[in-house]
Design a protein with these regions (language model features):
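Topology signature of small-to-medium multi-pass alpha-helical membrane proteins
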Residues: 2-152
Length: 152
């Protein structure tokens, strides 16, 4: 493809990255708020499922919270930076970080499935499979369809 002419699909991929990065930031803020209220959430008016979810989060521990927080920041930054790289068609910033995002996201989804209690999304469920779709699609598109569209 001629330099300066960005494929529409690559632009769409960048927009999706920005949307997912923003969504991740909102989730990160929710995670921080949840951590701030650990132990202060009244559960007497909740049903058993909600109580189990709150208790699972409260029993998660600080190290698990830090792990989730770090993964969220890393994923969000990779999405944002690779999205910018897609728009500028930069090899390292777009293609490179996009591939890193795909690999990190797949690995973190698998680790999360094993580490988290079922009450808070652990185990291989439909949400795990849905969470794997975008990173896999990203890897496939970057290494086939858009492989030649990145410069310097």
């Amino acid at each position: 493809m001629s330099e300066g002419k960005r494929p529409g699909g690559l632009t769409a991929l960048a927009v999706i990255n920005f949307v997912f990065a923003a969504w991740g930031l909102i989730g990160l803020l929710g995670l921080v708020a949840m951590f701030a209220f650990f132990g202060k959430i009244p559960t007497d008016q909740m049903d058993e499922t909600q109580k189990a979810q709150i208790e699972a989060f409260q029993n998660m521990g600080l190290s698990m919270f830090i792990f989730i927080f770090a993964l969220s920041i890393i994923s969000g930054l990779l999405l944002l930076l690779s999205g910018i790289g897609y728009l500028k068609q930069k090899k390292l910033l777009g293609w490179g970080l996009g591939n890193v995002y795909g690999i990190v996201s797949i690995i973190s989804s698998i680790i999360s499935a094993f580490m988290f209690p079922v009450e808070i999304g652990g185990g291989f469920r439909i949400t795990t499979m849905i969470g794997l779709i975008y990173p896999i699609v990203t890897l496939v598109l970057l290494n086939t369809t858009f492989k030649e569209d990145f410069t310097n």
